[in-house]
Amino acid sequence: MMLSIISRLTMTIPELEEYHWAQRKKWFEQGKMPKKIRFREICYPVFRLFLTVDRLFRKQTVTILNASPKKGGKAIYACTHIFENDLENIYEKLGRGCWWFVGDPRFMYRHISGLFAYLNGVIFLDTDNKEDRRIAYLRSVQLLKEGGSLLIFPEGARNGTENLPVMPLFSGAAKMAIETDTPIIPVGIEQFDKRFVINFGNEIRPIDFQNDVELTKTLRDTMATLKWEIWEKEHMQERASLPTNYSKQFRELFEQKIDPYDTPQTIEQTRFHTKAEVEQNAVLTHLDKLIPCKENIFLFRKR
């Protein structure tokens, strides 16, 4: 049963997450899939105007290094993920309408941005819910099969590293592309205070790859190249000129820019972890349960 807006306004964020997950599950079981795809694409100029006005109020500017190569036909826009407003600024400059793939909406459930996303077309999911991830994937596939387009952040979390252009990617975008024969448009974005720089890449055709592993690797390499081109254009600092406490400064700046419901801990949990990372963590986890003795003391020595 749908709760009234007033009732939802009194709910906590965890309660809202549980409520909306239950709604998504019910709609999926009832066979409800993305609707009014074409109508929402036609309404894109209205959304774009709203985003432009909002950006001007934030006193932000956007520079396009290379424009988007695809204006018609379905596509998956795979974007690097940085700070707040990256999605909005990319979408404003995209030049066409598409649905958004958004994980862990949290505050968006009771914020005007959530209503905006819903009107535009969005697929929400809780990233720690396996069933919700499956439903979001299937709804995305259906959207693409119906001719719609999708904007997604395959890193799965904001990039909080000091020197990685792109973190390891989830394979979902590649699997969607292969299953629906949809080209992927890689997008790199970087922020310099109030100025954003966006770099659109050429389309990657899934038919050119044998499997999603190869496609994901190529996608990440291409996204990293797009970010590197931005850094090169902006004349980033050389390593020798960086302050000795640069890492600390970066972490402090990063934590200031992420939304209040994101923390370095939650970002670490939601990003993609490679098999090597998982195996390493599994090896080290048992150390917390070991009782030091002369037979195992070597495991606790700092190297």
Q: Which stretches of residues belong to each language-model region?
A:
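Catalytic core of membrane glycerolipid acyltransferases/transacylases, capturing the structured
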Residues: 71-130
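Helix-to-loop junction immediately C-terminal to a conserved catalytic motif
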Residues: 47-81
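A short, surface-exposed helix-loop junction/capping segment
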Residues: 23-35
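Soluble or luminal CAZymes and related metallo-dependent hydrolases
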Residues: 41-45, 132, 215
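Short hydrophobic helices that act as membrane-entry/anchoring signals
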Residues: 7, 11, 36, 40-58, ...
